[in-house]
Amino acid sequence: MNSSLPGIGDILFYQRRGDRIRELVAERLAGRQRPVVAVGHSLGGIVLLDLLTAGQAPPVDLLVTAGSQSPLFFAIDALGSVRLGQDVPPPFTPWLNIYNRQDLLSFCAERVFAGIDGIQDQEVDPKVPFPASHSAYWHDDKVYQLIRDNWPRG
């Protein structure tokens, strides 16, 4: 249980200071040579989704999330930028959402954001149990292959 406590602190900090965090991320994305691919793991996926759905970010050609709770936060109406029942603005698509059934902090997006084109869930299986599965994405070659396969052309 102790290993999850820093994550809870991060989420609480983001809930309190999310505007400044999103502002810093938007500054990092601004002026980048296209294509721009934004990659977020766990809370980073929430930050990116909040940023992109609020219309505060420069254009992003592909959103990649791994082990993200964004779909859960949307389903329980806890995202800061878009409310359950509202139309979700599409500037964050295409969205490649990578999840792992062993990762209890990872959620599918296609069903939760039903009716929005451009969202693709892809499952990986690094074959490690939770909680190690939550950090295992970056040790799985399939994750990098999925990003390569979805990299924007042009």
Indicate residue ranges for each PLM-predicted region.
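Lipid deacylating catalytic domains
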Residues: 1-39, 43-154
